[in-house]
Amino acid sequence: MSRVCRNGVLATGDATPGSFPAGALFFETLALRAGSVECLDDHLLRLRAGLDRAGFAPGPLAAGDPSAWRSAVGLLGGREGVLRLVVGPDFEELGLRALLPSPEVFRLRSLSTLRDAPEWLPRPKSAPWANSLAASVELRSLGVGAGVEGVQFDARGFVSEGSRSSLAWVEAGALHVPAETTGRLPGTALGQLIRCAGLPVRAVETGVPVRAEAILVLRSTLPGGASAVSHWDDVDGRPLWSGDPALARPWLASLAAWRAQRCISFA
């Protein structure tokens, strides 16, 4: 157990992945670095879309009230970590956990845990996120290291997203992303990449993109919001794709520059 800020007051809680307070509806995870919250507005737009669709009004944190955020971040007392905002019908809970080191290059591993059907499209980031947690459990059971991200497919066999990340790849001069119909989340870092990559965008329903020139793992808590991929293996560990991670550098740099302009300090 740790301390969380619940409705503006410090309380006992648990901000670890997979642990949610009773009544949790939606959540967002954000990076806190050097006292600044990264891309807060992007996360809150997605959160409010879910609340609006479910018929709930946003509280001060979900509404982006600067004074509420400054107070909550101050109460938690950290300058670096992963902030998790969880909202329910009658509460907002902001927690802070450690920001673990992130690999510069990922290896992908196909998983057998299928992406479940979303409540609606575009998919809301709803608690308790049980399907992604099951995918993460499967990935850990394979005995892989921290530099491996699991990939979920929908029931038709199309690439959906990573167990903790969004996916995108460059192929034939275009940025390819899984279509929303695969059940993937509208990831915040993915949305930013779409806007700043400078490439035509194709939303696709496809299996493993074996002709991709570069593949990216996108996650809001990664430095710069993304990392490159070097290999993609099937569920049994057999190779499906490999590439030079350096080819992803132009898009990683563009995304990092975009995100650097969207940090808010509550110090």
Language model feature labels by segment:
Residues 74-81, 143-144:
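Short secondary-structure junctions
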Residues 1-63, 68-71, 88-267:
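Helix-start/capping segments and mature chain N-termini
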